[in-house]
Amino acid sequence: MAESGESPRLSDELGPVDYLMHRGEANPRTRSGIMALELLDGTPDWDRFRTRFENASRRVLRLRQKVVVPTLPTAAPRWVVDPDFNLDFHVRRVRVSGPATLREVLDLAEVILQSPLDISRPLWTATLVEGMADGRAAMLLHVSHAVTDGVGGVEMFAQIYDLERDPPPRSTPPQPIPEDLSPNDLMRRGINHLPIAVVGGVLDALSGAVSMAGRAVLEPVSTVSGILGYARSGIRVLNRAAEPSPLLRRRSLTTRTEAIDIRLADLHKAAKAGGGSINDAYLAGLCGALRRYHEALGVPISTLPMAVPVNLRAEGDAAGGNQFTGVNLAAPVGTIDPVARMKKIRAQMTQRRDEPAMNIIGSIAPVLSVLPTAVLEGITGSVIGSDVQASNVPVYPGDTYLAGAKILRQYGIGPLPGVAMMVVLISRGGWCTVTVRYDRASVRNDELFAQCLQAGFDEILALAGGPAPRVLPASFDTQGAGSVPRSVSGS
């Protein structure tokens, strides 16, 4: 929140995974922008809104930094404070023809997400959307995945929020010192440090080889067993967990997003009744929705490949960068009983989390990050093994405000990195939202899918006991004929 002090120091060097994300910005099929859509109970004061982001950009340097890539790969790409930083390029406002509903804002979000960020500037934008029904507004916060992941973004942008509607004014932090560093400058800097880097690399390699040789001599069986075990684990981690769905195989550049709202207490109660966690209940509800959709179209399946990102951040880690890995599940969409479905999901998640090679992508990212673009895109296309990705991002438990407006809901809109569907669960202020962004070449019946999404999570909420709580559609109505965001009409 705005009360917090200066954020932990972020590394100026792009990590290999971050650089992979950055390189993907040039291709619409590998673009990895993430977005938070926040629904506000009123229109924020514009000057206060801008000031919040101005101050945040002074406290969190990453919001003022751009990426500089050396002309030749003699050094790692770096984040540098942009000498041409202009807040007006990043913080904008638009007025929709209205009164607009969440449906129109989601459609606007699709346009923004599919528009490339300017890689010569800091990689984020915040768009205030005015003109919604009942005097409400929305904010669309768009960030490149090269900057941070979902969990890191929560911490990075905590500076813009308040815990009360009208807090006392706060002092303005000092302005960061801009840096003039060109790609050629960074290349020359890398060349100058090359002898030291080579010697250091050789010494590290020799040290590692001596250490490995010593272990092999003293414990030959366990050393060989450990290497083979890691290799087998790597195969399990990288291999597809289930056969892909025949309905979800096509890909395009046309996408759509749907969303539902659930009270956090209701989902927690249902999860507890089913013997699982909120994440288990969330994934089970998603599987139930996918089962209904497949059955309605006459293509029943028992499983499909689903990737679930797992946060690797430790307490005290800096907000920037990507610190997650993926767990591949054979999602039990064909399991009818919701409790049995939750148990199968929990068992797989527990087993996969314990894999020695769970973070193998992070291990090979340094090699992948220096491959030619055409080769990298070919490899990426061949290793995407999931139909669906499903993330879970906890945000802030209590009420929060932005420039005088209360945040009613937050919806997480993720990228589609070769998958048919990206699903994000956000928990904030006593509510959960489930936002599904899908490729319309894979999911062709929008109305049917929305109905299946609602029914799949209603089934999970029914575990909470009577009177059973119900899902509240956010981007559609129950008849599929309109777009009334009824879930927040009385908030």
UniProtKB/Swiss-Prot annotation:
Catalyzed reactions per annotation: an acyl-CoA + a 1,2-diacyl-sn-glycerol = a triacyl-sn-glycerol + CoA
Pathway the protein contributes to: Glycerolipid metabolism; triacylglycerol biosynthesis
Gene Ontology CC, one term: plasma membrane
Keyword annotations: Acyltransferase, Glycerol metabolism, Lipid biosynthesis, Lipid metabolism, Transferase
MF term (GO), any: diacylglycerol O-acyltransferase activity
Keyword Lipid metabolism: yes
Enzyme class, broadest EC rank: transferase
InterPro entries according to UniProt: Acyl_transf_WS/DGAT, CAT-like_dom_sf, O-acyltransferase_WSD1-like, O-acyltransferase_WSD1_C, O-acyltransferase_WSD1_N
Domain of life: Bacteria
UniProt keyword Transferase, yes or no: yes
Active-site residues (renumbered): H145 (proton acceptor)
Gene Ontology BP term (one): glycerol metabolic process
Family according to the record: Belongs to the long-chain O-acyltransferase family.
UniProt cross-references to NCBIfam families, sorted A to Z: acyl_WS_DGAT
Function: Upon expression in E.coli functions very weakly as a triacylglycerol synthase, making triacylglycerol (TG) from diolein and long-chain fatty acyl-CoA. Has no wax synthase activity.
Protein name: Putative diacyglycerol O-acyltransferase Rv2484c
Organism: Mycobacterium tuberculosis (strain ATCC 25618 / H37Rv)
